[in-house]
Amino acid sequence: MLYATQSGLSSEIKKIYRVSGFSLLELLLVVALIGILAAFAVPSYQTYLQKTRFMEVVQHTHAIRVAQSACLLQAGDSVSACDTFGELAMPEPLTSDNTQSIGVSATSGIITGTATAAAGNYTFTLSPIINSRGLLTYTVGGSCISAGFCKP
């Protein structure tokens, strides 16, 4: 049985109260550390989401590149023979939450994909080049390069 002494509570009761729970200072320190970590993590996560959304534009553009490459194999060296969706035998791509527009430039055959604001408003271009030996290559361009969303 525990009895109160004249100076207050007995030593056993003091020990019980001394070791229980976290202090307010410890809890504030943990909350501050979580806040600091979140301040660095949230902007990085937003950039990651934007890059992921922009990849939809890149995928649509590459799908048109495959169709254009097949068309150019049949048409020979004439890029202008493969510069519309009708000549590529494919429907025009639909817009989405991430893709504002996808198009093929007349006569030059440059494929351009434009992202929406959710994906950064960047552009991605693929320019077909047929060299003197008849080899087809594509040059990557657009505002996505300077933003680090795509590689040249």
Please give the residue ranges for each predicted region:
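N-terminal leader/signal peptides at the extreme start of proteins
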Residues: 1-24
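Periplasmic/extracellular, small/polar-rich flexible segments of pilin-like filament-forming proteins
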Residues: 72-152
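Internal alpha-helical transmembrane segments of multi-pass membrane proteins, especially GPCRs
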Residues: 26-29, 50
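Conserved alpha-helical elements of the SDR catalytic core
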Residues: 41, 48, 68
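N-terminal alpha-helical signal peptides/signal-anchor transmembrane segments
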Residues: 57-76
